[in-house]
C-alpha cells in the first residue's frame, strides 16, 4: 500500500509556549508533501520530522490568524536560500496575497522560483486541488474570520492484475490497462472473461480531514462521514464551554461528538490552549465519548492505512 501519512509539526494555539509549536501539519501522500497551516517554527519542524523540502509544492492555509501563517515568510525565504527553482503554490482564503506581497517584494527579491497564491471562498465546500493521486476540498468552518478545513481524498487505485490468470488466458500486454480499470477480456475465440477472474480489488481509497479553527459545527458531519482520520481542534475542556463559544473554538468533548457522529475511524485532537499544562484532561474528556482519540504531539507521524498507527520521530 502506498504511503499516506500525517506529520504533526505543531499543535499549540495562539499563545506561544515551551511545550508546543504553533499549528502546522504535513500530509505525505505517495511521496508528495502538502502542508496544512504554517505557524512559527514550521521550517524547523520540517527538518525534525525528516521531510524533504523539495517535495513540498502546495501549502493550504485555513485562515489568516498569525498562529496559522506566521511561518510562511521564513519558509519561503529558506527555500530561496536552498536554491529552490520549483513553483510554490499557496492556497488560502482571500487576503493572504495582499498581506504577503509587500513582504515578499522586500525580503525575497531574488527568489529563483515563483510563489503563486490561490484564494478561495470559505462558505461552501470547494474543490481547490486535484491531481492523479488526491483531491482536496474545503470544509466550511465558523471562526471569528473566514476559515475552512480541508478534506484530503485519495484517488482510488486501479485493480491489481492476477498474473497467473492473465498468463492462463494469454492476455496481451496492451490489454492490461483496460483490465486494471475494470474491463472484461474477450479471447480470440469470442469467450468473455469477466474482470473479477483477472483482477483483485486494490485497497480502498483513504481520507483525512483537518478542522481548525472553529466553533462546534455539527454541519460538517456529512462531509466527513466515515473518513479514516480526523484532526479536530480541541482548544478547551468542557468546563470552558462558554469561553470556547466566545472565542469561536471547540471543546474536547465537542470534537469527540463530531467524530462519533461522523463515524470516523480515528480522532486526533490538538490546537491546545496554553492554560493546560496537563493535556490528559482533554484526552480523557474526548475519549469518554469517542475512545479512538489520541492527543496530537510534535513530531508525531500517523500512518493512514484504513486503520491507523502512530510513531514519533526523534528530533535531529
Curated annotation (Swiss-Prot):
Keyword Zinc: yes
Positions with a binding annotation for Zn(2+) 2: 67-68, 213, 271
Listed Pfam families: Lactamase_B_2
GO MF: 3'-tRNA processing endoribonuclease activity; zinc ion binding
Keyword Transit peptide tagged: no
Keywords: Endonuclease, Hydrolase, Metal-binding, Nuclease, tRNA processing, Zinc
EC numbers for this chain: 3.1.26.11
Active site location: 67
Reactions mediated catalytically: Endonucleolytic cleavage of RNA, removing extra 3' nucleotides from tRNA precursor, generating 3' termini of tRNAs. A 3'-hydroxy group is left at the tRNA terminus and a 5'-phosphoryl group is left at the trailer molecule
Bound cofactor: record note: Binds 2 Zn(2+) ions.
PANTHER family: ZINC PHOSPHODIESTERASE ELAC PROTEIN 1
Subunit description: Homodimer.
Family named by the database record: Belongs to the RNase Z family.
Name the record gives this protein: Ribonuclease Z
Organism: Bacteroides thetaiotaomicron (strain ATCC 29148 / DSM 2079 / JCM 5827 / CCUG 10774 / NCTC 10582 / VPI-5482 / E50)
Taxonomic lineage: Bacteria, Pseudomonadati, Bacteroidota, Bacteroidia, Bacteroidales
Gene responsible for this protein: rnz
